């Protein structure tokens, strides 16, 4: 395993640990998930470049699209919770039930 791959896997692991530690605030959780998605994107891009497989070149782009959708939905939920309750605690998520 090269040093670059090890650094990317370590960045993913640190983002996962950050998500587990700072899960009480929605903004912190969103930032950690974004770090996880970006490290997965870089790892998928490096893998596609190393494989020289034409169909594998679409995988990082698809992953980036899903990351953008996740970020947009998460930020919309953050704005809704912040405007309604004045805080971004994750405990307020079950208050949004119909």
UniProtKB/Swiss-Prot annotation:
Reaction(s) catalysed by this chain's protein: a ubiquinone + NADH + 5 H(+)(in) = a ubiquinol + NAD(+) + 4 H(+)(out)
GO CC, alphabetical: mitochondrial inner membrane; respiratory chain complex I
GO MF assignments: NADH dehydrogenase (ubiquinone) activity
Topology of this chain in the membrane: Multi-pass membrane protein
E.C. no: 7.1.1.2
Pfam family name, one: Oxidored_q2
Transmembrane residue ranges: 1-21, 29-49, 59-79
InterPro entries on file: NADH_UbQ_OxRdtase_chain4L/K (IPR001133), NUOK/Mnh_C1-like (IPR039428)
Alphabetically ordered keywords of this record: Electron transport, Membrane, Mitochondrion, Mitochondrion inner membrane, NAD, Respiratory chain, Translocase, Transmembrane, Transmembrane helix, Transport, Ubiquinone
Its biological purpose: Core subunit of the mitochondrial membrane respiratory chain NADH dehydrogenase (Complex I) which catalyzes electron transfer from NADH through the respiratory chain, using ubiquinone as an electron acceptor. Part of the enzyme membrane arm which is embedded in the lipid bilayer and involved in proton translocation.
Protein name (record): NADH-ubiquinone oxidoreductase chain 4L
Species per Swiss-Prot/TrEMBL record: Hyperoodon ampullatus
